[in-house]
Design a protein with these regions (language model features):
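N-terminal amphipathic alpha-helix/helix-capping segment at the start of soluble metabolic enzymes
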Residues: 1-18, 80-85, 256
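Catalytic cores of alpha/beta
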Residues: 25-35, 151-161, 203, 207-223
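Glycine-rich phosphate-binding active-site loops on the catalytic face of alpha/beta enzymes
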Residues: 40-50, 117-121, 126, 171-177, ...
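Hydrophobic faces of well-ordered beta-strands that scaffold small-molecule active sites
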Residues: 14-18, 43-45, 91-95, 120-122, ...
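Active-site-adjacent beta->alpha loops and helix N-cap segments on the catalytic face
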Residues: 1-7, 50-59, 71-81, 101-107, ...
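Alpha/beta catalytic cores of nucleotide-metabolism and tRNA/nucleoside-modifying enzymes
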Residues: 76, 191-199, 208-257
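Active-site beta->alpha loop and helix N-cap motifs at the rims of alpha/beta catalytic domains
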Residues: 47, 60-122, 255
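Conserved, mostly hydrophobic/aromatic
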Residues: 16, 35, 46, 112, ...
Length: 257
């Protein structure tokens, strides 16, 4: 069983996201440890990028703060090397194709394998272009995780059939951020996914409260939260890891019911 599969093996998964380097890499490391200790099943790590097109203002701000504080792809790799000494849950990078290309795709993926990264999410990579990365991901044992936005049944089925790791279901069209309510018919999307793959699926974009997380994991196999965690970093700065740990515990308790 892959490391990512284990995250979903014993019940519903809670998946937090954090932008590496906001406000600094030391705080990111402490936050990763706090999330893992408080029940996170898998953590998405954002590699900062100057033009994060899928992100709303909260995560865009985190990217800019991280870059201004000196975060680089190499420094993020070093951070993962350090936390991997004692964090065993799956870690997945979420970044943009340009970050991987500019680093050198093979060099990027071989480093991911070396430091213990289990998967890669590239929100700006269209399904039709995934073969630019898929062979290298397979070569280095890194799952290329696909995103499914509200779209036609045929397209959902096509993406689901080739799913690796887990499927990231986008709760609504648009950018990331917290929402008061999610109106997309997610149950219909999940139904098509499950008819076409045994790969687990998690819902992200717009989840911030325990009630929303419980509702989403009533439909899918996991809930993904980013903006709400970034807001804690914005509010508490270097003191945020303790707050993040408490938040993750509340969210994990909610998804496990």
């Amino acid at each position: 069983m892959s490391n990512i599969a284990k995250a979903f093996a014993d019940g519903k998964a809670f998946i937090p996201f954090i932008t590496c380097g906001d406000p600094d890499l030391k705080t990111t490391a402490a936050a990763i440890h706090a999330m893992a200790a408080n029940g996170a099943d898998l953590i998405e790590l954002g590699i900062p990028f100057s033009a994060p097109t899928a992100e709303g203002p909260v995560i865009q701000g985190a990217n800019l703060r991280a870059l201004q504080a000196g975060a680089t792809t190499d420094k993020v790799f070093d951070l993962v090397r350090e936390v991997r000494r004692d964090v065993t849950i799956p870690l997945v990078f979420m970044t943009y194709a340009n970050v991987v290309f500019s680093y050198g795709a093979e060099r990027f993926l071989s480093t991911c394998a070396e430091i213990g990264i289990d998967g890669l999410i590239l929100p700006d990579l269209p399904y039709e272009e995934k073969d630019e990365f898929a062979p290298l991901c397979r070569q280095y044992g890194v799952d290329l995780i696909s995103m499914i936005a509200p779209t036609s049944e045929n397209r959902i089925a096509m993406i689901a059939k080739e799913a690796e790791g887990f499927l990231y279901i986008v709760s609504s069209l648009g950018v990331t951020g917290t929402r008061s309510e999610i109106k997309t018919d997610l149950a219909a999307i999940v139904k098509v996914v499950r008819e076409n793959t045994k790969t687990p699926c998690a819902i992200g974009f717009g989840i911030s409260t325990p009630e929303q997380a419980a509702k989403m994991t009533g439909i899918a196999d996991g809930a993904i939260v980013g903006s709400a965690i970034i807001k804690l970093l914005e509010q508490y700065g270097t003191a945020a890891p303790e707050q993040i740990g408490a938040y993750v515990k509340r969210m994990k308790d909610a998804v496990r019911g």
